[in-house]
């Protein structure tokens, strides 16, 4: 159902472990074109966790800055800060974890720092090489990537939209296959989770 072009309700079906049924029955509260709150009347959970997590039952669950950028999402329990380019500079989670981003003057992401508990992971992006805590981990290619720890190639097979559907090893063996809901969530994934880039939609 739509109101002036904005979706005000949405129902999704999905895999509930052994059955298939309603995983989301969402109603949206808007303030103009900005989302103010989401309520989910569905009680079932999806087997892959892609159902909406209704983490707050408040009149206002989403807050924005003067630029219209989201600064609080109470359903996900996050707060977002932005830099002068209006790019996210830090995301704070309700459990105390943080993700901090560093960009070049052109807005290209150079570094991500994850802090979870007492563990800090620093990821640096240097052209097509990804470093983790100072060690080169991946070399990105047009066809996929090379894992630098074992010097093995991994190839992406994409669909007509450019979504990564299958990842194969250098011998052509399947490592991962992904099947998507129309909204982008993975409803089935076979094999190992060998790459993070999935739905492009």
Residue ranges and their predicted role:
Residues 25, 58-60, 76-78, 98, ...:
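Short loop/turn microsegments at loop-to-beta-strand junctions
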Residues 9-15, 37-42, 66, 71-76, ...:
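Beta-turn initiation residues at beta-strand->coil junctions
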Residues 2, 29-30, 65, 83, ...:
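Short, acidic, Ser/Thr-enriched surface-loop or helix-capping motifs
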Residues 1-53, 106-108, 113-115, 121-122, ...:
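Conserved catalytic cores of ATP-dependent inositol ring kinases
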Residues 26-28, 61-62, 80, 101, ...:
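A residue-level detector for well-ordered beta-strand positions
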Residues 49-81:
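Extracellular repeat-rich scaffold modules on cell surfaces
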Residues 20, 28, 150-201:
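A motif-centric feature for acidic-aromatic and gly/ser/thr-rich catalytic loops and repeats
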